[in-house]
Amino acid sequence: MTRNPNVAVTFQARMSSNVRDLVASGQFDLGIVADEIDSTGVAVEEFARFRVAVAMPQGHPLETLDVVHPSDLDGHRFIALAPEDTTRREAEEAFERAGVTIRPVVETPYSTTICAMVAAGIGVGLVNPLTAEPYLGHGLVLRPFEPALHFRTLLITPPSRLASRNLEEFIGHLRAAV
């Protein structure tokens, strides 16, 4: 932005499906969305991958583990991602393979909500570690989850529009930032 002071960037946080609709209609030049969206009407490429982590309140018994497995979560109050979330579905498969039944006390579409609830001591949950960074040292601890699962984010653009040089540069800066 400092290299192009006459270019304005508008940042809006919205549900992935809303972002997809705005990009498909040409109202947005690009969007960064969760991988479970319907990609009809947009050009799609993977933007980033982050390994799933288990978020737990500071001082939680699971904090003593180096890695958390599905069986370790059995019986703990679990804050889950929304049922349509790709990562949640993959986690449910991992729990099923391990013979573990997780009964969520809360469901939410956002890792940041899980982090806030975990920091408040409500339970544990699987989160995107990038989203959890502001909570580290503020009541929340992360441990890797095994088997390795990943949050995937997609970069979407209108399919029939060529990206401008400014947009290509901006996308490059976004990729470098993550």
What is each stretch, according to the model?
Residues 39-50, 65-66, 112-159:
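Beta-alpha-beta core module
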Residues 7, 24-33, 52, 100, ...:
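Alpha-to-beta junction loops
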Residues 15, 69, 109-110, 128:
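Short loop/turn segments at beta->alpha junctions
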Residues 39-52, 56-78, 164-165:
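Flexible hinge/capping segments at coil-to-helix
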Residues 62-63, 70, 76-98, 163-172, ...:
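Secondary-structure junction motif
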Residues 1-40, 108:
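Central regulatory/effector-binding core of bacterial HTH transcription factors
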Residues 6-10, 101-105, 152-154:
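Residues at or immediately flanking beta-strands
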Residues 20, 24, 44, 70, ...:
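Short hydrophobic/charged patches on amphipathic alpha-helices used for structural packing
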